[in-house]
Amino acid sequence: MRHRLIATIFSFIACFAVYAQDVCVINGKIADDKLANGKAIKKVFLTSADEYGRRTVVAEAKVKKGSYTFKYKVSADAPVMQYTITGFDNEKGIKLFVEPGTVAVNTATAQNPCQSKLSGTPTNDLYEEYKQIDINADEKVAKAVEALAQQNGKEWLESKEGKQEVKRIEATERIKREADRIRFLIDHNASPMTPLEMECRVMPYLSNAYAEQMMKSVYTPLQKHPYYQSFRNAVLARNIKVGNEVPDIAITLRDGKTVKLNDNRGKYILLDFWASTCEKSMQNRNTLKELYQATKEEQDKFVIVSLSLDSDKNAWGDTLDNNGLALDGWLQGNNTMGTESIAAKQFGVKKTPHMILIDPEGRAISLNMEADEVQMRVEQILEGDLYYLDQSKE
């Protein structure tokens, strides 16, 4: 009896320890585990995605008789993020949020994993409720079209008048659906799901001013979350002009460390997009070296941030070394995505060179400057005589 009691106590301690480590347990059940090729799915993968949608497998699980389990440890300070369970046909997957607790994933068929139902943790329960908005809207459209068919006949639906009426019904429900989404997200503005959905699903339908109001509606403590930062950058990128705040882009340095543009708040920043394969960019290196020498004692006031769009990191590094550009305090970053990178797109960079001057509050002073304007503007900064037209209220 005593041994059994001790074993029970140790079992309880072990279970408690698992949850004390912030583990996300995902229990999946697939009713019909047959893929399109007729074979049963054997393995699934838990994948994360970067800002470009590139997936990384973080865990895998065997599927036995339609069941699988992931036990994924979540660090105590990790934000709640969306992952995807993959391994199904045509790169389809099950989107869910990884957070401490147990998530139940019920999938009717392996051929359509997107229709899976989630339950068990706060964000996933809320996400399932949010997805119901789409389901309800689709059902309303289907019922309305069916009512038209019963009233006028199915052949009438194929007529010009019938098709126009179906389009009217679909457009009406689409507007109602977007309104329901906005209302839902505002009502649940403290969920990490909210800024993600605001950016991906809602913002494309909003004006710049409305998108900015949506951004401001997010719960203040959530504003350090990566999804909020991404949403905020997307909103700011829509309206870049002199006097407006610019996006807070990430810059990967040569040593692999990532810094943010806003890490230099309180200083004037020269943001310099360039490429070693661009002749004019290389000509500007000499101007910027002279500028660096003239301002290196003023790095508490002014900093140069150069973001290379070279696709070849080695070529970029060689260019820095061969041209004496690896200098203390001159931030040199690289983005191998070129003009397709998020940073380039958010700043509207179509080609290099592209230089932007930013004030200590993170607002644009000058956009797409030539080298001579850069020199003039920096002289104004050092002399305390900088001026620019504030267009943010126009």
Task: Enumerate the predicted regions with their spans.
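Bacterial Sec-dependent N-terminal signal peptides
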Residues: 1-25
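N-terminal targeting signals for export/organelle localization
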Residues: 91, 103-104, 110-113, 117, ...
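Short, internal strand/loop/helix patches
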Residues: 317-353
